[in-house]
């Protein structure tokens, strides 16, 4: 049994989704396009990185074979390893959305088979009666934005007016989400969190997946900067997840990063917060020391998506992958006999793609135990196979979706 460690590299898709055309994402390939840009020198940035994409640890764990299975081709410029370690494959998503809750819940054995509510792309994003209810319930003079937007762009556009007027900046995206940006000092972080809780309640009839608090600091567009105090307010998963089943079996679920928020704090034994991939890795390594037999440590590495994918920053995404890969030997040193490590993703966010939204892609599955014989696990038909593999490994009853690949 030992322990399980589930790491989600947020948005690290590997292309090839059979239903990508339905989402306008045919050809999207986060890994493949990053590698292509790196190989061409288009992801060189002075003081950050240069040259072909270099991920020797994940390549040795089967990442390049995963890419080949997903898309039919190896990533450009990345040398094939002489030997492979662990299990490797990829998975299709059966949830209808390409958003964070859908991906994570499906990973945890609970696909989202219903349709989320979404806001219109033309005209005002939010209905007048909703805006009126929010302003009345939260005692606001009004809102700014009321549109589809990139988070950094809309703060630059409305940040100064927000500071002058006290009106929060409200916006959405192609995901089922209501995002609220507000200044940590001028508006107040606690007030922003309280506002998000009010909006979460008002949005339930609209079937919106998440309300996200996006605090920022600075005084002008030149120095506005989002802080690490983001909070996600999600609806509850539609049925018990792997996390609920583990807690019911008296195991501990250690949620690192935004995992607690994604699951609406249900099925969580302990929450460990950290900001930035490297600090998230530090927190994860510490939690690995503290986890007991039968426990799950579940970490979301959000920067790949939030800082690089949505901002279409290819060089930044490549450098973040290389920095993550370089720390995997530290993870390996923490593993005990019988421990299971799984690396995966929740969706794609191809930084070379049009727009700023997520992309529908297959996700990688890398699974490793000390001494395990390397083999491919093929293309899995649902992310839920990941959760069922963890359930099997930790010795709890199987759930209704997915099947273990162990």
UniProtKB/Swiss-Prot annotation:
GO terms for biological process: 2-deoxyribose 1-phosphate catabolic process; 5-phosphoribose 1-diphosphate biosynthetic process; metabolic compound salvage; nucleotide metabolic process. Signal peptide: none annotated. Gene3D superfamilies: Alkaline Phosphatase, subunit A (3.40.720.10), Phosphopentomutase (3.30.70.1250). Mn(2+) 2 binds at residues 305, 310, 358. Keywords: Cytoplasm, Isomerase, Manganese, Metal-binding. It is found in: Cytoplasm. Isomerase that catalyzes the conversion of deoxy-ribose 1-phosphate (dRib-1-P) and ribose 1-phosphate (Rib-1-P) to deoxy-ribose 5-phosphate (dRib-5-P) and ribose 5-phosphate (Rib-5-P), respectively. This is Phosphopentomutase. The lineage of its organism: Bacteria, Pseudomonadati, Pseudomonadota, Alphaproteobacteria, Hyphomicrobiales.
